[in-house]
Design a protein with these regions (language model features):
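Conserved loop->alpha-helix
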Residues: 1-173, 180-181, 190-253
Length: 253
């Protein structure tokens, strides 16, 4: 488990092929304290939980499966990444409980300064919409953040046609997304009712970023149309599953 409080900005220095379309990442740890990290320990890279397979002079190496590469963004090439070591039970939870299991991808719609802060607006696919609530928690590229506004929008209104095809595919339901609960093919987080027979839509949510968060994470590099890793709040995940099975189980004494 993690807290969503980024400990350091590291850098993927090298990406090497590793059987069955996986890769090995050579990561420079930057200011991350590696003194207590052992082979087999977990480190979140851009919000994705990875297992340390080797310690190096500058950091560590991890193996990433083809499935993880398909379900995430930011792990297939070199460049800066957010890093966080797995939490201890004695640690303060400065953000919220984060598993490091990416639920799906989002697309940056806006990232702009507002006074001393920055407004970050992200579009999420329908499968994750039901888990996004006002003042709820969301993990973006490994950073624990608070949602300040949620709005469902038609794709035609929300999506810029100039964005890369990968971004437009994610929002149209053609990209990778994990249904956090429910049977295969069931998007438990999807809204129903008013959206059921209407045009394709997505969920826009806004976040206010304080200067410290911008400075200490890779979020400063975000631009419209860029993909980000999203992990929903664990509590929301369990509530959705409980709602799904309500009425299907016999009454408990």
């Amino acid at each position: 488990m993690f807290t969503g409080i980024v400990a350091a900005i590291g850098s993927i220095r090298q990406v090497s092929p590793l059987g069955e379309d996986g890769v090995r990442l050579d990561v420079a740890a930057g200011e991350l304290d590696m003194s207590d990290v052992a082979i087999g320990d977990s480190i979140a890279i851009q919000g994705a939980c990875m297992t340390v397979v080797e310690k190096t002079a500058e950091g560590f190496a991890v193996d990433v499966s083809a499935e993880s590469l398909r379900r995430t963004t930011g792990l297939a090439g070199t460049g800066p990444v957010n890093l966080e070591k797995a939490m201890r039970l004695s640690d303060r939870v400065g953000g919220h409980l984060v598993s490091g299991h990416v639920d799906g991808l989002g697309v940056v719609r806006r990232f702009e300064p507002v006074g001393e802060s920055h407004l970050l607006e992200i579009l999420a696919p329908q499968a994750l919409a039901g888990f996004l609530v006002y003042k709820g928690s969301i993990t973006v590229d490994g950073v624990s953040l608070t949602v300040n506004h949620v709005e469902d929008l038609p794709l035609a209104k929300a999506v810029d046609p100039a964005w890369p095809e990968a971004a437009r595919a994610v929002l149209a339901g053609r990209g990778p997304s994990v249904a956090p609960a429910g049977a295969p093919g069931t998007a438990i987080g999807a809204h129903s009712g008013a959206h059921a027979e209407t045009e394709p839509w997505c969920c826009a949510f806004q976040i206010n970023l304080i200067p410290h968060t911008v400075a200490q994470t890779t979020l400063k590099r975000l631009t419209p149309g860029r993909l980000v890793n999203l992990e929903i709040d664990t509590v929301a995940r369990y509530l959705a599953r409980m709602q799904e099975v309500a009425g299907k189980l016999p009454a408990q004494n």
